[in-house]
Amino acid sequence: MTEYSKEEIAIMKGEVCPYCGSKPELIDSAEIYNGTSYGKMFICRPCNAYVSCHVGSETPKGRLANAELRQLKIEAHEVFDIIWQQKYKRGRYQAYYWLSKQLQRPFDFTHIGMMDEESCRRTITLCKQYLYKKDPDKFPQYIDG
């Protein structure tokens, strides 16, 4: 099982920019989304890395992400969410538990919002392989993971 340093945990929790090490700034998401507010966010302006906060709070959903990581998180959620939403696992909690075992990460740090690029890529591959194995007729596009 992977163990994390205090610095790595601070990055995964959105307290430190993973690209430059600076402390991110709390803003309203309207600044990013052309005037439409979806709540609070943390941003590192020099790196153009940001993360949204849990609804109604100032708690980041995970690590700050640049454009590449934001896209990988979207792709990881697209394939991972199928696993729990279509009941291939009993629920979201069980799906994350399965993923934590596959990635050999502590459960508390197995959330797509906390992942870096490598972990997102591994999640995408693992989930595609799992779905293809469970239902190859429904997921033929995932034959290669």
Predicted regions and their residues:
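N-terminal cysteine/histidine-rich coordination modules
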Residues: 1-58
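Short, well-structured alpha-helical interface segments that form or flank functional binding sites
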Residues: 12, 39, 71, 94, ...
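Extended interfacial segments that mediate partner engagement and assembly in macromolecular machines
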Residues: 57-98
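Intrinsically disordered or highly flexible coil/loop and linker segments, enriched in small
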Residues: 85, 89, 108, 133-137
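Short, surface-exposed acidic
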Residues: 90-97, 101-115
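Chromatin/DNA-recognition segments of nuclear transcriptional regulators
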Residues: 109-129
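Long C-terminal interaction/binding lobes of large macromolecular proteins
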Residues: 130-145
